[in-house]
Amino acid sequence: MKPSILEKLQQLGDRLEEVTHLLGQPEATSDMDNYRKLTREHAELTPVVEVFQNYRLAQSDLADAEEMLSDPEMKDFAAEEIEAAKAKIGELDTELQKLLLPKDADDDKNIFIEIRAGTGGDEAALFAGDLLRMYSRYAERNRWQVEIVSANESELGGYKEVIARIIGLGAYSRLKFESGGHRVQRVPATESQGRIHTSACTVAVMPEADELEDIELNPADLRIDTFRASGAGGQHINKTDSAVRITHLPTGMVVECQDGRSQHANKAQAMKVLAARLNDAQKREAQAKEAAERKSLIGSGDRSERIRTYNYPQGRVTDHRINLTLHKLDFVMDGDLAEITNALIAEHQAELLAAMGD
């Protein structure tokens, strides 16, 4: 391990002692904001320091075993101990490097997930509905909440566009690599000849901005229009102008919300979505620069990239970024995404570790 990393780990150990001491003071809870920050820092530092302590213990075991080599009667036992200690040190070294990887400040946040039907017309809209169900079922498995923010339904079912809010700790960390093009190959229900059609949807995953603090919205940059909410096919479902459309004039971004109970609720939700989109645009620009520098396949933020294919006749799902193919399409569409999300996170960590070693 590099001396600079060892020094950093020692500093983290010292800081954990300091934070533990501060939390133990009688006046610690007098400033609740500071208390929460210290508690969060303590929770982040503890696993790193514990692994580092195990690392130093393994190094001590190695040194003891090497000393035993000089004793002829202990030589074989010492050789086994040395091999075991070296293997343990290697494992802990890798674990420590992962723990020291820069944290994404957005990882613990709620998300907005935006699904848009692309090529394929009605079939693409139906697939957008399937994707929404897939992410909703995944959220249920993680005990997260799902709220529909805005939905533009198609006449045959499914959605031309739908925005959902997923509320739960770590939602962004698990789903941030879902952004991109999702392609489906299947025989549509309306296809009498049994021919396989290819359709596509675009998914955008955006962390929810913290109470509009992450991004500044100048009221002069916003045009806010109200209109009547409507259901599928355009039929009016209420007689008041409760739906809200917000246009961000500098970028041309438009957000519509009509699923709330009131104009006030729709406006508040639309502002949240707009803030998340603007925040996300800035984040993707930065990611694109970083990805270009390190030739990253994961987390480049490129929405035009086709990331995954769902092939129904073969019961197959393929993630093209990491060449992962799973023959369990039914399970995946029912929200069993853990194998895919874990593989994507592992690949992203490997890229970051490689960048650290450069």
From Swiss-Prot:
UniProt modified residues of type N5-methylglutamine: 235
GO-annotated molecular function: translation release factor activity, codon specific
Compartments where found: Cytoplasm
Keywords noted in UniProt: Cytoplasm, Methylation, Protein biosynthesis
Single GO cellular component term: cytoplasm
UniProt signal peptide: none
Annotated Pfam families: PCRF, RF-1
Keyword Cytoplasm: yes
InterPro entries (UniProt xref): PCRF (IPR005139), Pep_chain_release_fac_I (IPR000352), Pep_chain_release_fac_I_sf (IPR045853), Prokaryotic/Mito_RF (IPR050057), RF-1 (IPR004373)
General function of this protein: Peptide chain release factor 1 directs the termination of translation in response to the peptide chain termination codons UAG and UAA.
Family: Belongs to the prokaryotic/mitochondrial release factor family.
Protein name: Peptide chain release factor 1
Species of provenance: Neisseria meningitidis serogroup A / serotype 4A (strain DSM 15465 / Z2491)
